[in-house]
Every structure is written in structure tokens, then in C-alpha cells.
Curated annotation (Swiss-Prot):
GO terms for cellular component: plasma membrane. Signal peptide: none annotated. GO terms for molecular function: potassium ion transmembrane transporter activity; symporter activity. The lineage of its organism: Bacteria, Pseudomonadati, Thermodesulfobacteriota, Desulfuromonadia, Geobacterales. The keyword Endoplasmic reticulum does not apply. Belongs to the HAK/KUP transporter (TC 2.A.72) family. The gene is kup. Pfam families: K_trans, K_trans_C. This is Probable potassium transport system protein Kup. It catalyses: K(+)(in) + H(+)(in) = K(+)(out) + H(+)(out). The chain crosses the membrane at residues 18-38, 46-66, 97-117, 138-158, 166-186, 212-232, 247-267, 287-307, 339-359, 368-388, 395-415, 418-438. It is found in: Cell inner membrane. It is a multi-pass membrane protein. The keyword Transferase does not apply.
Length: 606
């Protein structure tokens, strides 16, 4: 699955620009415009904001993700679930592990909620640049929303075909985008070179001291420059750490040079409505339309990266059993990381269009943006402290703690957004969060309610029935959670109904706490005519069960699996039962041959 080792130095950097940096790379479209909608664009304030932008990107993206988090991968994979799996090995079961699991669920949910806001604000802000085209200045906002919605819907409709064929163009397009940002910024800085001094932290501190509470609240808009920074770590599995970090150093200076250029433009044109588009139009009116097209392409690529990221998170959630099984399609014949989850895709599409209609303008959308990002960054920081403090490099935990304090300061500043649209971040994140809680608790409660039988007890009755010699020719396959614990449906089939084959195989799939790795083992002679087939697979591995069975010489005549008919007065368990009914069962998820499947219903009281 991993192809990044063979990528060339520059090839890896170009790929990273296309796959990882779309979100943070499109932040200059709206960040300073939103900030100076709240703040008077005086020279002193411009210097203060530019300094805050520099240090926000340095601390929250470079230090937190590029330097610290990206060294905490598992077989090249990153993300909240990876951090949880690392900690699970370090912490004994108890309150602390429960806290870590809760943080993981929250972090995953916030990132998935972010998958709605990112495409909405990116595409809408790019389309709004059309009003600066001569003759389109009077274009009504409703037309801009319609155009943005059409682009978004087109992007989601295209998902089922996969991005394999066009993904090769993402990197080169983003290279042109970052080069354009850097060039435009450099030209503007040349007219006002004193803005280069804004890198000094003195200006950031002075701004915060001079503006007090208002300055603190401005941090909730400054954070927009770092949104998408978490993708460095979350997308590490696609390319590896080195290409992403190398690309980030180039992207960082391209972005900051553009922010400096916008700062210089603001000083000379404080009345401009959108600083990036205004700056480019002022510099090269003839190139404005090509630049606008490039901007829209960049936001589409940014949105695509976020959609693919959500698919990847959901797949991790499915295989680690924190989310229900969903239909997963593989859109690439050679890259198993290229997946499509239809139900998630259409839910995202509807949510993105609704968000566009609710907020109308990108500057309004900015009011909802930031809360989920800073929450996710804070959770990453807390988990890094817990991990690093338990390693031989415990001194790194001190740096992680300082960074986490900065994360929490930004998160606190973003809380003021709650009544101004920020509550949408909570609403969007609550959908996956509630689903995760209901599903995980429901699975545990269901397992207890099923009251499985110990293998030793089962064998006594099994041997008596098998010895009668009325066995069905061929091989019967029975799916179980663990081969030494027998579920009720197997007891019903074999013991009560005497459905017993010449060869009976219990098959169990165990997902390990590593992202990759696949080991299968056939244990023969557990009892007369009874074998166990165990598959140990990493939580990112795509399983081809039929192939594995053939490799071990198992030619099944029929495949049995359990179907639970849940009866409960509890509203939470009713929701769990509904989710279970509406989502694919285990055999459907693994695309086993329908002609050989036999579901056995077990009535369960929860």
C-alpha cells in the first residue's frame, strides 16, 4: 500500500503539496480579510497581525505537527487513532485510558465536522472573487452561492469514480498556486519592505497588550491561517514524514510571503474588500481571471483532500470497531488507500450545501471556523504530553505542554464564536460523536446480552452430535468474534438444529493496534472435524477473505453468520438497533459470495 519510499526528492514534495497542503494553502484567500473586518487596518495593527500569523504558523503547525507529532507515527501512519493506539500500550486499563479513548472519539468527531466547513468556506471564498471581474461587480450573492454549490455538488458526485486518474495533476496545480502566492506577495512587499520586520514577536505581544480582550478575541480569526495544519500528521500515511516536512518548509514561506504582501497592500489600500484578490487585480489586471480560475482549482483540491481524509478516518473507525460497518468501495486497482464511502459522501455533500445556504458569505462562515480545529489541536497536544512523558525523551513533553497551552489559548478565544455560528461546529461534530458512543457502548452491551458459550462447554455437546455420523458433506464456515468463545447462533445451528458438516471451521478476524500487517493461521483439530481460522490484520488493512481461505485450502460449502434481532425499551439501545439494521452486516462489508451465505437470527433482549 505504501509507495512513498520510491518517490524522488522533488516528486515527494510535489505530491505532498497536492495531497496535504490544500486546506492551509487556501487560507490566504480569506484569513486577513476576516481579521481586518474586526480590526482597524492601521499600520501598527497590520504589523501586529502579521507577527501573530507568523508565530501561529510556527508554533501550531511547524512545532506541534512537523517537529513533534510527526515523530509519533506507527508504521508511517498518523492521526488521533494512532495516538490512541500508542497510548493504549503505555497505560493500564482504568480512568486514564478511558479519558484517552474519550479524547480520541472527540478528536475524530471534530475532524469529521471540519470536513463540512472546509469545502464550504474554501469554495465559497474563491467564487466570491468573481465580483472583482469587470462587469460582474453587481453580481448578487445568491448567484455566487449557487455557483459555489454547483462546484461542491460536482465534486461530491465525482467521488465514486475515484481520484486516481486526476490526482497526478493536483501536485503541479498546487505548485503553481504556491508559486503565484509567493510571487504576488513578493511584488507587494517590494513596495513596502518594512513589513518584513513583522516577523518579530514584539509586534504580536504589543498588539495583544494594546488591544486587551479585543486582541484576545482576534486570535479566533488569526487561527484561520493554521487551519489544515493537522493534515500534516493525519495524512502522513500517504506519503511519509520526510516529503511532507520538506514540502511544508517551502509552503510555509510561500504562504507567509503572501501574508506579508497582503499586509503591505492593506497599508496602502485599507478600504479594499478582499485583500488577496484586490492585491492580484491591482498588480496584474490581465492575469486576474486566470488567477481566479487557479484559486477555484486550488480550493477544489483542498476540498478533495479533506473528503479523502474523512473517508480514511471513517475507514479507521470501522476497522477499529468504533463506527458501524458501512459500504466501502475501492476506487483504485493498485492503491488500497483510495476508497469511497457512499453514505458518508452524500451526507457530507448535503451538509456542505446546507452550510453554504445558512451562512451565505465566507466571512460569515469564518465565524463557525476555528473551534473544531483548535479543539483537535488541543487534543493532539494533550495526547502528545501523555506519550512523551512516558518515553526516554521526556524533555520533549515540556515543549508539548507549552504548545498545548498555546492551543488552549486559541481554543478559549474561539469559544466566543459559539453564539455567532460556532455552534455549527458542535452540531456537525456531535453527529459522529454520538454515533461512536452509541455504537461502542451498544456493541459491548450486545456482547454481554448474547451470553456466549465457552469452547470447552460447547465441545462436549459438539462431540456427541458429530459422533452420530449424520454430518453434511463439505465444509461449513462460522464467523465468530473469538474462536474460543462460541456465539449463540453457532450453538443454535450445531447443537440445537444439528446442522453440522464433515468439516466445520470457526473464523475470527482480530484487528491489531498496528495500521498494517496481516497474519493468518489455521488451527486444526480443536475437536473432531472442527478447526479454527484466525486472521490478525492491521486496522488499515483491506482484507480479501476469500483469497485467504483459498490459500489455506478451505473450500466452504456454506458460510454462516449471526444476525441479532434486538428487543429493548431503552431509547439508546433502540437507536443502536436502528443503526445496526440500516448498515451492512459483517459478511456484506467483506463482500463474501451471497450464494453461499446463511444468516442465523438470534433474538436478544437488551
Amino acid at each position: 500500500m505504501q509507495q512513498h519510499d520510491s518517490d524522488s526528492f522533488w516528486g515527494g514534495i510535489v505530491k505532498a503539496m497536492g495531497l496535504v497542503f490544500g486546506d492551509i494553502g487556501t487560507s490566504p484567500i480569506y484569513t486577513l480579510t476576516v481579521v481586518f473586518a474586526l480590526t482597524e487596518p492601521t499600520m501598527q495593527n497590520v504589523f501586529g497581525i502579521l507577527s501573530l500569523v507568523f508565530w501561529t504558523m510556527t508554533i501550531l503547525v511547524t512545532a506541534e505537527y512537523a517537529w513533534l507529532a510527526m515523530r509519533l507515527g506507527r508504521k508511517g501512519e498518523g492521526g488521533a487513532i494512532v495516538l490512541k493506539e500508542i497510548l493504549a500500550r503505555m497505560i493500564r486499563p482504568g480512568r486514564q485510558l478511558t479519558f484517552v479513548v474519550f479524547l480520541t472519539y472527540l478528536g475524530v468527531s471534530l475532524l469529521m465536522g471540519d470536513g463540512v466547513i472546509t469545502p464550504a468556506i474554501s469554495i465559497l471564498s474563491a467564487v466570491e472573487g468573481m465580483v472583482l471581474i469587470p462587469g460582474l461587480g453587481g453580481l448578487h450573492q445568491s448567484w455566487l452561492i449557487l455557483i459555489a454549490a454547483i462546484i461542491a455538488v460536482g465534486l461530491f458526485v465525482f467521488q465514486f469514480k475515484g481520484t486516481d486518474k486526476v490526482a497526478g495533476a493536483f501536485g503541479p496545480i498546487m505548485v503553481v498556486w504556491f508559486a503565484s502566492l509567493a510571487l504576488s506577495g513578493a511584488v507587494s512587499v517590494a513596495s513596502h519592505p518594512t513589513v518584513l520586520f513583522a516577523v518579530s514577536p514584539h509586534y504580536a505581544l504589543q498588539f495583544l497588550l494594546d488591544n486587551g480582550l479585543a486582541g484576545f478575541i482576534v486570535l479566533s480569526e488569526v487561527i484561520l491561517c493554521a487551519t489544515g495544519g493537522e493534515a500534516l500528521y493525519a495524512d502522513m500515511g500517504h506519503l511519509g514524514r520526510k516529503p511532507i516536512v520538506r514540502a511544508w518548509y517551502i509552503v510555509f514561506w510561500a504562504l507567509y510571503l503572501n501574508y506579508l504582501g497582503q499586509g503591505a497592500f492593506i497599508i496602502s489600500h485599507p478600504g479594499a474588500k478582499n485583500y488577496l484578490f484586490g492585491m492580484v487585480q491591482h498588480q496584474a489586471p490581465l492575469l486576474y481571471i486566470p488567477f481566479l480560475i487557479l484559486t477555484i482549482l486550488a480550493t477544489i483540491i483542498a476540498s478533495q483532500a479533506m473528503i479523502s481524509g474523512v473517508f480514511s478516518i471513517v475507514y479507521q473507525g470501522i476497522t477499529t470497531r468504533i463506527l458501524p460497518l458501512l459500504k466501502v468501495d475501492y476506487t483504485s486497482s493498485h492503491l488500497k488507500s483510495q476508497i469511497y464511502i457512499g453514505s458518508v459522501n452524500w451526507m457530507l455533500m448535503i451538509a456542505v450545501v446546507v452550510i453554504m445556504l445558512v451562512f451565505q458569505k465566507s466571512e460569515n462562515l469564518a465565524a463557525a471556523y476555528g473551534l473544531a480545529v483548535t479543539g483537535s489541536m488541543s487534543i493532539t497536544g494533550i495526547m502528545m504530553i501523555l506519550i512523551l512523558s512516558r518515553t526516554t525523551k521526556a524533555w520533549k513533553a515540556v515543549f508539548a505542554a507549552l504548545i498545548t497551552v498555546v492551543d488552549l489559548v486559541f481554543f478559549t478565544a474561539c469559544l466566543h464564536k459559539l453564539p455567532h455560528g460556532g455552534y455549527w461546529s458542535i452540531i456537525l461534530a456531535s453527529v459522529p460523536f454520538i454515533t461512536i458512543l452509541v455504537w461502542t457502548k451498544g456493541q459491548r452491551a450486545l456482547y454481554r446480552a448474547l451470553r456466549p458459550l465457552e469452547l470447552d462447554t460447547f465441545e462436549l455437546a459438539y462431540e456427541q452430535i458429530y459422533a452420530k455420523g449424520r454430518n453434511i458433506p463439505g465444509t461449513g464456515l462460522f464467523f465468530v468474534k473469538e474462536y474460543n468463545v462460541v456465539p449463540p447462533y453457532v450453538v443454535h445451528c450445531i447443537i440445537r438444529s444439528n446442522i453440522i458438516y464433515e468439516r466445520n471451521v470457526f473464523i475470527s478476524i482480530v484487528r491489531t493496534d498496528e495500521p498494517f500487517g496481516l497474519v493468518s493461521e489455521l488451527k486444526t483439530g480443536i475437536a473432531t472435524g472442527l478447526d479454527a481460522f484466525e486472521i490478525h490484520a492491521g486496522y488499515m488493512e483491506h482484507l480479501e477473505i476469500e483469497t485467504l481461505l483459498q490459500q489455506h485450502g478451505i473450500k466452504e460449502k456454506v458460510i454462516f453468520y449471526g444476525v441479532e434481532d434486538i428487543s429493548t425499551p431503552n431509547p439508546v439501545w433502540k437507536l443502536f438497533a436502528t443503526i445496526k439494521r440500516q448498515t451492512p452486516n459483517f459478511v456484506q462489508f467483506n463482500k463474501l459470495p451471497a450464494s453461499r451465505l446463511q444468516g442465523v437470527v438470534t433474538r436478544v433482549e437488551m
